[in-house]
Amino acid sequence: NTGAKAPREQLANKAARKTAQVAQSGGVKKPHRFRPGTVALREIRKFQKSTELLIRKLPFQRLVREIAQEYKSDLRFQSQAVLALQEAAEAYMVGLFEDTNLCAIHAKRVTIMP
């Protein structure tokens, strides 16, 4: 044996086999899927461009009221005060995730864990 490779399959045979497979399956096209990580990177770019708040306002407001209830009952909040708390909370979380990502990169990891 001279180590020669097996002869390549002819393109015509390949195309004929593909059309036969489509005919067998009834021509149903499977939905398009992006490679793992592509959508994640697109979302990262999208959210880094945006400036709007990412936590829904009402659930955050309920959380603020629930926490405040432990210290004093019947507290009232100006809407701007709740928005200021939300801005601060989201800014803190963004900074935390940035630091977490730097730590993950330093440890030669890709995924961050809680």
From Swiss-Prot:
Residues 1-31 are annotated as: Disordered. Core component of nucleosome. Nucleosomes wrap and compact DNA into chromatin, limiting DNA accessibility to the cellular machineries which require DNA as a template. Histones thereby play a central role in transcription regulation, DNA repair, DNA replication and chromosomal stability. DNA accessibility is regulated via a complex set of post-translational modifications of histones, also called histone code, and nucleosome remodeling. GO terms for cellular component: nucleosome; nucleus. It holds the Pfam family Histone. Belongs to the histone H3 family. One of its GO terms (molecular function) is protein heterodimerization activity. The keyword rRNA processing does not apply. This is Histone H3-1. Keywords: Chromosome, DNA-binding, Nucleosome core, Nucleus. It is found in: Nucleus; Chromosome. The nucleosome is a histone octamer containing two molecules each of H2A, H2B, H3 and H4 assembled in one H3-H4 heterotetramer and two H2A-H2B heterodimers. The octamer wraps approximately 147 bp of DNA. Gene3D superfamilies: Histone, subunit A. It comes from the Eukaryota. InterPro entries: Histone-fold (IPR009072), Histone_H2A/H2B/H3 (IPR007125), Histone_H3/CENP-A (IPR000164). The keyword Manganese does not apply. SUPFAM superfamilies: Histone-fold. It comes from Stylonychia lemnae.
